[in-house]
Amino acid sequence: MIFKAFDLERLLSDWEQTVEFNFAESGVHPVPLKELLEFADADLNEFLDIPLNYPEVNGDLKLRQRIQELYNGAGLDNVIVTVGASEANYILANTLLMEGDEVAVMGPTYMQFSGAASNLGAKVKTFSLNENKAWALDIEELQEAVTPNTKVIAVVNPNNPTGKILSEKEMDVLITAAEKVNAWLIADEVYGGAEREKTQPTSSFYGKYNKVITVNGLSKAYGLPGLRIGWIVAPVNLIQELWKRHEYTTVSSSMLGNRLGEMALRPHVRRQLLDRTRKLVGQGFDVLQQILDEYGSGIQITQVQTQKADPPDQVIDAFR
C-alpha cells in the first residue's frame, strides 16, 4: 500500500519559516518563555536543575492532574499525554481502525486524522458544515455518512478552518448518531479557548457519551506549540490500548514540555494565556476586516460564531 503524504503539512513546512506574511497560520503568535514564567510568577532558576530525563511515559503526574481537572468526571487514568495533538490523532487512528473500516469525518477540516485513516486502508466519508447556512451542520450528509459499519465519527470543535462552533443541539445530533451505530466519537478541541466572541471555552464533548474521546493540546489556544504537549481523555480501557501505540511511536513527550505544560495549566496561568489569545484574535480580526474593506473586493467574512441554525428536535429523534 502506498503511504500518502500529508500534502498540506508539507506545503506549510516548506514555506512557513520563510514567508513574511503567513495567512495559513492557524494559531496565535507564540508565547515567549519569559512571558510564561511571568504569568506563573516563576523563576527561570527553578528549571535549571531539572534533570533532562524521560518523564512518566503517559505524562507527568502533575500535568495529568491539571488536565484531569478540565474535564468533569475524568480521572487520572482517563488521561494520556502525547507529543502534541498530532500524535494523539495518529495513535487513535492506529488503535481504532483497520483496513476496510468506515470513518465519518466532519469537513472542512485539518486533514491529519482522515489522512492517517486512509493510510490504514479505512474508508473515509465526509459530512459537511454547510457554507450556505453559516456553516451549520449538514444533517442530511451526516445521515448518509454514518452507517452501521461506521467505527469512528471525527469532528473538530471549534472548527478549523471555518471557526464554526457547534451548538448544543448540533453536538446532540452527533452524539445521537454515534450512539445509534455504537461508533467512537473523536472530538479534537484544540481551539477551545481561542473563541473571539466568548469569554469561556466551548463546552467539551467529554462525558456526553461513553465512547467520546477528546483530543487537546497547548499549541493553538494556549500559544505554546513549541512545547509539543497534547493529550487524550478517553475511557480507561482505551487509554491502555493507546499507551501501547504511544510506546512504539514517541515513548514520551519531553521533560521540559511536561513541566512547562503543567505550569501553563495552573488556573491563574491558564486564564492569562487564554485572555492573551482572545486579545490577539480580536485584534487580528479587526485588522483583517480593515484590509478586506479596502482591498478585498468580492471577499466577505461570515461571522459563524454568532450564527445558529439549530436542527429541530425531530431531526435529533430521527437518529435514535
Describe the role of every protein-language-model region.
Residues 211-278:
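Conserved core segment of the aminotransferase class I/II
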